[in-house]
Amino acid sequence: MKIIYGPKGTGKTKAIIDGANAALDSAKGHVIFITDTNRYAYDLKYQIRFLNVSAFGLQNEDALRGFIKGIVAANGDNEYIFIDGIARIAGKPVSELESIFAAMEKLEKDFEVKFVLTVSAAKEDLPEFVAKHAN
């Protein structure tokens, strides 16, 4: 798992889009990009599966966790899952998302999928369960 962090307006979304596009060049499996807006859909290479969670009515952490697990379960060829704004999508501060981070760690281990996430916070404000994945 990789965390792209920083206060709002520090280029996290551009960094995750660039990361997804770069991952596609070396990926042997599928690359998926999850966010809650269509704003950046055309910044991603067309081969990346773009999912706007707003279209699926996700409104909380449990729904997001189920959505992510469903994506992994539906296709064993998924290699990368990029999530822009996980706390915003889950509707909670990142400090309250330990269970979804634990679920993603388990998915990485069990299904060899790699997660890349953006979190709007300074490094010193990241909870330990997030900070251990931040560079």
Question: What residue ranges belong to the model's regions?
Answer:
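Conserved P-loop
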Residues: M1-G70, L126-E128
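Amphipathic alpha-helical interface surfaces
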Residues: K12, N60, L64-F67, F82-I86, ...
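N-terminal targeting/trafficking signals and adjacent low-complexity tails
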Residues: I71-N78, E98-S99
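Short loop/turn elements that form and flank the Walker-type P-loop nucleotide-binding site
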Residues: A27-K28, L44-Y46, N75-D77, K109-E112
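Generic beta-sheet signal
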Residues: K2-I4, V31, E79-I83, F115
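N-terminal cationic-hydrophobic initiation segments that often serve targeting/anchoring roles
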Residues: L24, V72-A73, E105-E108
